[in-house]
A protein has these predicted regions:
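Bacterial Sec-dependent N-terminal signal peptides
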Residues: 1-33
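Extended soluble regions of mature proteins
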Residues: 30-226
Length: 226
């Protein structure tokens, strides 16, 4: 395996963790749209990443690029299924990692549980009227400033371990991924737009030319083992 391929796979690993965090969060928000697209920005390893989150009443798909890899995360409305699609055309890699229900529960259980304290601070972010809510991690007592809006509502397409009780749709917030040492790594997310644009055809399905693998197989890829 070349050095560049190893670096790209490691970047993919970081991207998957952050994207899963974002999917869990955004799917939890109470939305007034029945279907549409959420665009969000974040950064990882010094690279700016734009994510497209397509949603319906019963499905969510998050799509983004990490180096040469195109990633798509698929989940159902209740977050009872989770699939990671990895397409790296340069290396002829097309994989679909299917998580088991127990594996999904393990991932979700690692995330913080928050209590919330609304503030009187307000500002506009991406055209949304937002108010600041201070979220406190019940375990570590660390606090996070979460900016939420009541300008829009979105369908509850998953049960969130994040900001379901924040009092609005999070627009600027902290997301979490599990690092290689087992500790949570934080990333900042900003939603830049919410539209009624429908997902492209086939967005929520596993393509027929993708090889199905396990979560363990995916983690081996992320460590550069494949």
């Amino acid at each position: 395996m070349t050095k560049n391929k190893t670096m790209n796979i490691k970047l993919l690993s970081a991207a998957l963790g952050i994207a899963l965090s974002a999917t869990v969060m955004s799917a939890s928000a109470q939305k007034a749209y029945t279907a549409g697209t959420v665009t969000a920005t974040t950064s990882m390893r010094g690279m700016d990443i734009q994510m497209k989150e397509y949603f319906t009443l019963d499905s969510m798909a998050t799509a983004f690029a990490a180096g040469p890899a195109n990633i798509r995360l698929l989940t159902d409305a209740n977050f009872k299924s989770f699939v990671v699609l990895v397409d790296v055309s340069a290396f002829n890699v097309k994989k679909a990692a299917v998580y088991t229900p127990d594996e999904i529960d393990q991932v979700l259980s690692a995330y913080p549980t928050f209590t919330y304290a609304p503030t009187t601070e307000t500002k506009q972010i991406s055209g949304f009227n937002c108010k600041k809510v201070v979220a406190t991690d019940s375990k570590t007592k660390k606090t996070y400033d979460i900016w939420v809006t009541n300008d829009v509502t979105l369908p509850a397409s998953a049960t969130s371990k994040y900001y379901a009780g924040a009092g609005g749709v999070p627009i600027q917030y902290t997301a979490f991924q599990k690092g290689q040492d087992g500790n949570l790594v934080e990333s900042q997310f900003t939603i830049t737009s919410i539209t009624e644009d429908k997902a492209p055809k086939g967005t929520f399905a596993i393509p027929s030319d993708f090889d199905k693998i396990s979560k363990d197989d995916l983690e081996a890829m992320s460590r550069g083992g494949q």
